[in-house]
Amino acid sequence: MTLKMFLPVNLVSVCMKLNNSVVMVGLYYGFISAFSIGSSYLFLLRPRFLNDDPDAIEKKASETAGFFTGQLLIFISILYGPLHLALGRPHTILLLLAPYFFFHFLSSNSGQYPSQRFAFPLLTKSMRNRSFQLVFLHSLLFQLFSLSVLGRPMLTRLSYIYIFRSNNKMLFVLSSFVGWLIGHILVLKWAGLVFVWLLKFIRSKTMKYITCNVLIPATKYIIEKWRNSFVAGLIREILAMKQVESALVRIKNSRLLDDVRWWIRGSGLISGLKINIRFYARLILRGFENVYVGAKFRQDMEHLFSIILFAFFLLYLDRTPLLYADPADKKLQLQRKLSNETQAAREEKELEERLTEKFEAQRRAQRAAQRKALQEFKQGVVESYLANQAAKDENQIQAQKDEKQIQAEKKATIRAEQVVQYTFGLIEAQRREMEIEAARAMQEAYKGMLAAEEEDVEEGVQEKQEGFPEEPISPSEEREENPKLLILKEKISILTEKISILTEKNDLFSFEIPIITSLFDPQKPLRPLRYIKTCAGVEKAVKNEMSQYFFYPCRSDGKQRLCFTYPPSLATFWEMIQRKMASRFPRIYTKAKWRALRGSAPGSYRQWISRNKKKKNSLSTEFQNRIQTLDQKKSLLNVLARRKRSSLQNVLETRKRLCNYKTKKEYLPEIADPFLTGALRGKSDPEVYDGVRKTSEIKVVFLKNNITMATLGNKNDDDLREEKNAISLLSRMKNPVNKLHLLFVNERDYPFVKPLVNRINGPAVPKKKKTISKSKQNEIKSKQKKVKSKQKKVKSKQKKVKSKQKKVKSKQNEIKSKQNEIKSKQKKVKRKQNEIKSKLNEVKRKQNEIYPKGVKFNATPKTEINPHGIRFDAATIEKYSFATGYSYRPPSFHDIIFKAFVTEPQRNKKKVIELEEEINKQVPRWSYQLIDELEQLEGAEGETQFSDHEIRILPFKRVSVFTEKEAKKKPLIDEEGNYVRHKKTYAVRFLGHMSDFRRGLIKGS
C-alpha cells in the first residue's frame, strides 16, 4: 500500500492538488513579495557594513524586530479597514513624517555642528542613551512609510489582491506570511555572503585599480572635511556639476559653436568633471575599506546612508501628487467661470435681439391686420346702414351689445392677468426679503431682552438670598419658573426655524468641499512621463482622471469581491451618499442595511447558496417530470381515447415573445421575432398569424400557445365559440406551424377531432362519387344568384337608412356641442373674473402689509421692463394705443416665448421651433503648459516670454534662410510708407541621426 503512493500517477495527482491548494499559493506569493526590495531594506543592510561596532549585534536585533513588527502591522491593516485607512491617509503621513525628519535631523547632526544653533545638548544626550529604541523606531516607521509615501512594489500588491479573490483568507494570510519569512531569511543570508565577498575583494585589490594622473593634495584633509559636513559638500558638488553641464549645453547649442570649440578643448572643464567622478568613486570605495580597517569612517558611512535615503525620498516624492492645492488650478477655475459668464451674457444678448425682432415683426403684422379690419368694418357699417336703415331689430342690437361686452370683458381679464403676473413676482420677492430681515431683527431684539431678563433674574435671586438666608434659591430654578424667559426662548426658536425655512436649500445631496481637500488632494492624478499634445489647437494636455486600475469591492457570485477596474468617481459618490443618508435617516439606513445592499453581510453568501440550490433542484425536478409525461403519453390517440385533459401544455417551455405593452395581445410575426428560434423561426402561414384588427366583422382567437385568428361574422356567442375552436383546430391540423401543436388538444375538442383522427388513421377506402344532373346544377346556381341579389338589395337599403340616421345624429350632436361650448365659455369668464378680483385683493393686502400707508404703489409705470430684459418706452405705448384704441400693456415673458413659437400642429408641423440646450462637457486638462527648447527660443525672440523648458527634444541647429542681398532687392514698406527692416527667418536642422528615446520626456519624471 505504501509503494502505491510513490507511483508516478499518484505523485502527479498529489503535486496537482498541492499546486491548486491555498497553502502553496500563499507560500508562492509570500516568497515573491520578499524579493521586492525597497528603501526599507537599507536599515537591515546598514549593520552588515558596521561589524566592528560594539553595539552592532544589538542594533541588528532591534532593526530586524522593527522590520518584522512593521510587516505584521501591514498584514493586519489588509484585513482591518480602519487601520489601512489611517496608514494610507495623507494627514497621518504628514503627522508621522514631519516629526520623524525633525528628530532624525537633530540626532544625526548633533555632533557635527557644535558651534551652531542646531546643537541641543539635552536632546542629544537623551537620544544617545536610547539608541536601540531609535533604531527600532526607524525600521518600524519606514515600513509604514513604504505603504503610502514610498513606492510600493508590484509583487507585494499581488498578494494583497489575491487575498480578496481567495475563499480561505486566513489560510492564505498564514501561508503567505510563512513564505515571506522564508524569503526574507534567504535574502538576508545572501546579502551577508555578498558583503563578505566584497570585503575580501576590496582587501585583495587595495584600491590599486583606481588611478589618477592629477594629484589631489591633502586627501586626509578632504576626508576630515567630508566627515564634518558630508551632505552639504555633496549637494554643492552636485549643483556645480549641473551648472557646468547646463553651461556646456548652452554653448553647444549656440550659434558660435565653431568659434568656442577651441576654448572647450583648451579649458579644463572635461578633465575637472572626470576628476570629480573619480573622486566620488574613490571616496565610496575608501569608505568600504575603512569600515573594516578602522572606526574613523563609520560616521561617513552613516551619512552616506542618509544621502541614499534622501535620494529615495526625492525619487518617490517627485512622482506623487502635491499635498496642497495647485494655485494654477484655481486660476483655471476662475478663468473658466469668467468665460462661462461672458458666454452666458452673449447668449442672453442674442436671445434678447431675436425676441425683439420677432416681437416687432408680430407688432407690424398686428397693425396691418388691424388696418384691414378697420377698413372692412367701415365698409360693412356703411352698407348695413344703407340696407337696414328702415328696419332694425332690437334682438340684433342686443346681440351686438352682448358680443361687445364679452370682448371687453376678455380684454379686461387679459390686462388684469398681465398686471398680476408681473407685480405678484416682485411683491413676493420683496415680501420674502422683508420677512427675513424682520425675523432676524426680531431675533436679535428677543436675544437682548432675554439677556436683560436673565440679569434681572440673577439680581433678584441674590436679593432673595440676602433677605432670606434660610431658603436659598438657585438662578436656574428661578429661570425655569419665570414665564417671561420661557416665552422669549420659544419666540427665538420659532424665528430661527422660520429663517431656516426661508433660506433653506436642498441639502440632502449637496456635497460641500471640506477644508482638508484644499490642503490634501489624494485623488489628484500623477504627473505624466511624456507630454503628448492631442490636438494642434489645444494648448494644454488632457488629464486622465479615470484610473485603469482602481480597486473597489463589489458583489459577484453572491460574495463581496474586489473589482480591478472600478470607476473612482462612482466609489466616492457611493461613500458620500452613505454618509448623507446615514446622517439623515440613522434608524433606516444602518450598517447592516448597507452591508446587505453591498452583499457583505455575514448571512448573505449562505442565502445566495441556498437560493441557487433551490433553483437547481426545482429545474431538475421539472425536467424529470417533463420526460416522464412525454414517455407516458406516446401518441395523440391514447390521449384522446382516455378522454382526459392533456397536461402536455405545461410540459414544453413557453417562450418569451415581443408584444405591445399597452394591449399585451399584439405580438410580432414569428419571422421577425428575435426570441423565437428553431422550428418556429422562418416558417409562417399567411392565414395563420398573430395580430389584432379592431373591426366589426373580424375577431381574434387567442389560446394559451399564442394560436391564430379567424374571420367570423356577427353570430351568437355559443356558435362563435364552436366555430372558433373548429377553425383553429382545422388550421392546426392542415397547416401546422410546428408538429408539436397537434399535441395541444383540450378535452372539449374531442368530439370534433375524433372523426378527423379516424379518417387519418383509418384504412384507405375509395369513396363513390355522387352524380348530379346538369339541369339540377343549373337550378341550384340560379337560386343562389337570386338569393345573392336579394341580399345585396337589402344591404343597400340598410346602408342608406343607416347613413340618414348618422346624419341626423351628427346634426343633433353639433347643436348640443355648441350649446355646451357657450355655457362653458360663460362659466370660464365668470371664474376668471372671480380669480382676478381675488388676486387684486391679495395684491392690495400685501401692498398694505409691506409698504406704509403714505407710500403709493404704481402697478403700471411709464417705462416698464419685461422679465426677459426688453424695455418699453412711453412713446411706443402711446403709438400702439392710438392705433389700436385701447391702453397698451407689454406682454409677459410667457406670452413672448410661447405665443411666438407655438403654431397649429396639424398645418405647420415643420415650422415649430424646438429650443434645445446643448450639453457641453469640460475636458479635464493639466494646469501647466510645458514647452521645449525650440519653443522657448521662439518665444524669447517674439513677444511672448516663457520660463525654462521642461521637455526633452533632439539636439538641433538653427540655419539662416535668406541673405542680405535678397533683403535689399525686396524692401518692405508699411501702410504709412516707411521702410521696414527684414526679420531674420531661420530653419531648424536636427542633429541627431539616430532615434532618441528621450524625446518628449518631461524633466524629473
Curated annotation (Swiss-Prot):
Keywords: Chloroplast, Membrane, Plastid, Plastid inner membrane, Protein transport, Transmembrane, Transmembrane helix, Transport. The lineage of its organism: Eukaryota, Viridiplantae, Streptophyta, Embryophyta, Tracheophyta. Its main location: plastid. Belongs to the TIC214 family. One of its GO terms (biological process) is protein transport. It is found in: Plastid, Chloroplast inner membrane. Involved in protein precursor import into chloroplasts. May be part of an intermediate translocation complex acting as a protein-conducting channel at the inner envelope. Residues 783-810 have a biased composition (Basic residues). Part of the Tic complex. It is a multi-pass membrane protein. The keyword Membrane applies. The chain crosses the membrane at residues 25-45, 67-87, 91-111, 131-151, 177-197, 304-324. InterPro entries: TIC214 (IPR008896). It comes from the Eukaryota. It comes from Oenothera berteroana. This is Protein TIC 214. One of its GO terms (cellular component) is chloroplast inner membrane. It holds the Pfam family Ycf1.
